[in-house]
Amino acid sequence: LGDVYKRQPVHGDNYLYIYCLWVAGSFKGKGYAKSLIEYCINDAKEKGKSGVCILSSKKKKPFLADKKFLLKYGFKVVDTVKNEYELLALSFNGEKPYFSESVKEMRIIGQELTIYYGLQCPYIPNCIEQVQEYCTKNSIPLNLIAVDTLEKAKNLPCIFNNWAVFYHREYETNHLLNETFLKKKFQL
């Protein structure tokens, strides 16, 4: 897998990991997602990869790939976490990727608002800034953890799509936060 894969709590021999497959709503129905996934599959085959994998969920969730769309291209569920999040893979040789064992609990030790983040998504720096400002202004304890090494990525306590939020030890969401979402979701 490429460098993006190295920042995921996923193991797979020679797999290409799709971090994000998203098309803005205004472009829906124009075939862009189809073109992107077909290009990715062909690129992986040309590069001799074992397959392609991506994070999804049983029910559609924000910031995660649409499972129904991927199933149309032959992707299959190869691993699950908490009977909710799924690793989908399109294997070219029968080998299957899997989540790191550390992902299975989806819990941390700390009680404070804790965010694990990577910087592959262009929206993340702005979200971090908004969360820091809001928490500082309202005296809310905040723990920000940059996932900036291979070791941190492979030992994450949760599924990860470059943003993972915990509160009172529990995994809450991969939804990017801003002031409005903080107030609504956590009553902070």
Show which residues each predicted segment covers.
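Conserved acetyl-CoA binding element of GNAT-fold acetyltransferases
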Residues: 7-25
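Conserved acetyl-CoA-binding loop-helix of GNAT-fold acetyltransferases
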Residues: 23, 29-45
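Conserved GNAT acetyl-CoA-binding A-motif
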Residues: 44-61
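Conserved catalytic-core motifs of GNAT/GCN5-like acyltransferases
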Residues: 55-56, 71-88, 172-175
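C-terminal "cap" of GNAT-fold acetyltransferases
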Residues: 82-104
